[in-house]
């Protein structure tokens, strides 16, 4: 046991394992791209596979060729092994390709009138992944539930400055936005329950549908005048409804990203949402268009998921993103720790998928129209 080394204990476990104290031995070259890890938890001993960089600084143990052959025959081809290998390959590709910076600020509304489709998870994880890649992002939590604010561990009690003050009172975004743990690259305009009364408060207000657009434009102009780093993305997490808040988001945005589950009810909802977006574009914002559709909670094993994907691609061939977000406990768990999954458990399948999605979105930014700040 002299060559064995205690590595660390983890609240998250290891690649989906239950939390455990990990005892790791590394053998490089066992699978080519991956290394064999010998993981000892408090309760049991298992053989596992992981990325080579996890093994840095850990003493090596030379398992016998017979043992290696046995492990490869038992594990290679299993769903766990295949997924881990796919995640590692995907991460390497993300690092290799990098993220493209848009030529001008892209304002993206993340919207779906149906709740529970991964809308907020998509908004916060895409924002975090873009910020991690060095791009500057402003995330606007426009949902009265404030889940996007919670996802970053930001307090948003009733009565404190929030997006409500921006839309109703005309407060500058710069006075409300909060810096996250990712630093200046990611700021969040928090939301709270005050926003639920905005329908009544703006009932007779002049230009009530364009309040957020003016606030965003003024913020971008303010950043440019101050000589600060240009804002690459403004991402707006919309509420699951088509009320005045969502209309404000659509009027402010140049693009709409629609996260949707791979189920047939979602197809009906998609048709209704796109019709509403078209109407708003004709009346208030000709630049608005559905630029991206992301399939979430996707189970590639089911025929239903594949059929829905095919239908969406048939009707929206250019908007449907190739990256699909799988069902993942890690994605659901992360907000309880005040982090998006891409930072909380960056090697998990859900985190890898969102990093790929964010990269795909950034690559589309080379040709996608954005909303540049204009001075009057």
Predicted regions and their residues:
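P-loop NTP-binding core
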Residues: 9-17, 22-376
């Amino acid at each position: 046991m002299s060559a064995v080394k205690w590595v660390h204990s983890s609240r998250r476990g290891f690649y989906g394992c239950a939390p455990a104290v990990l005892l790791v031995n590394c053998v490089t070259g066992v699978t080519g791209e991956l290394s064999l890890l010998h993981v000892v938890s408090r309760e049991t001993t298992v053989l596992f596979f992981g990325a080579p960089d996890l093994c840095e600084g850990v003493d090596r143990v030379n398992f016998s060729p017979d043992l290696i052959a046995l492990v490869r025959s038992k594990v290679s081809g299993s769903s766990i092994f295949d997924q881990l290998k796919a995640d590692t390959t995907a991460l390497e590709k993300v690092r290799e390709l990098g993220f493209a910076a848009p030529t001008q600020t892209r304002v993206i509304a993340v919207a779906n009138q149906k709740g529970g489709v991964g809308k907020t998870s998509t908004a916060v994880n895409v924002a975090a992944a873009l910020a991690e890649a060095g791009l500057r992002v402003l995330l606007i939590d426009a949902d009265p539930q404030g889940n996007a604010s919670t996802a970053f561990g930001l307090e948003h009690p009733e009565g404190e400055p929030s997006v409500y003050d921006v839309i109703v009172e005309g407060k500058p975004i710069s006075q409300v936005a909060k810096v996250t743990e990712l630093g200046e690259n990611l700021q969040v305009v928090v939301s709270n329950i005050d926003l639920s009364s905005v329908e009544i408060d703006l009932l007779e207000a002049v230009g009530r549908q364009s309040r957020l657009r003016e606030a965003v434009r003024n913020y971008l102009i303010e950043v440019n005048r101050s000589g600060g780093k240009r804002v690459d993305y403004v991402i707006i997490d919309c509420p699951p409804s088509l009320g005045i808040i969502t209309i404000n988001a659509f009027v402010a945005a140049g693009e709409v990203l629609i996260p949707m589950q791979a189920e047939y009810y979602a197809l009906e909802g998609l048709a209704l949402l796109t019709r509403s977006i078209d109407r708003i574009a004709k009346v208030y914002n000709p630049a608005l268009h559905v630029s991206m559709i992301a399939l979430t909670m996707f189970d590639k094993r089911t025929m239903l998921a594949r059929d829905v994907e095919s239908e969406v691609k048939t009707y929206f061939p250019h908007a449907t993103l190739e990256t699909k977000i799988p069902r993942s406990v890690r994605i659901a768990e992360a907000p309880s720790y005040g982090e998006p999954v891409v930072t909380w458990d960056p090697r998990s399948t859900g985190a890898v998928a969102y990093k790929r999605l964010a990269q795909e979105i950034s690559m589309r930014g080379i040709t996608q129209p954005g909303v540049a700040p204009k001075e009057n």
